[in-house]
């Protein structure tokens, strides 16, 4: 389930991790990266962090797949002050996105 940091050389995400934080996986959306760690979810683009929340601050995740379009991943935080994220996931990232959803689901069931 876990991937080592050195296996995923993505500076968009790696510089955000704490020294003892474990990156489980990341998936690329059209305009951003979703990272799933042992502590939190991160959504970042090349310019900034769009969302950085722990699992206990997550309200809902929705994944929709339609014919002839990228999938849509919606991440809704519990607090209205944290902006929901709408990510377009290309077909080549579906497997990673599905693994991310499994980890997120496990974490939500624990909180």
Q: How does the language model describe each region?
A:
Residues 2-8, 99-111:
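Short, charged, intrinsically disordered terminal tails
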Residues 15-19, 92, 99-102, 106:
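Polar/charged alpha-helical tracts
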Residues 1-34:
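Anionic N-terminal interaction surfaces
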Residues 65, 77-79, 105-108:
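Generic hydrophobic/packing signal
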């Amino acid at each position: 389930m876990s991937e080592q940091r050195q296996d995923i050389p993505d500076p968009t995400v790696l510089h955000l991790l704490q020294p003892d934080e474990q990156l489980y996986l990341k998936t690329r959306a059209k305009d951003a990266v979703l990272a799933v760690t042992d502590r939190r979810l991160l959504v970042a683009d090349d310019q900034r962090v769009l969302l950085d929340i722990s699992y206990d601050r997550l309200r809902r995740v929705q994944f929709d797949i339609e014919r002839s379009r990228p999938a849509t991943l919606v991440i809704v935080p519990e607090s209205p002050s944290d902006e929901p994220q709408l990510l377009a996931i290309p077909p080549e990232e579906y497997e990673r996105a599905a693994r991310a959803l499994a980890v997120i689901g496990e974490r939500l069931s624990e909180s």
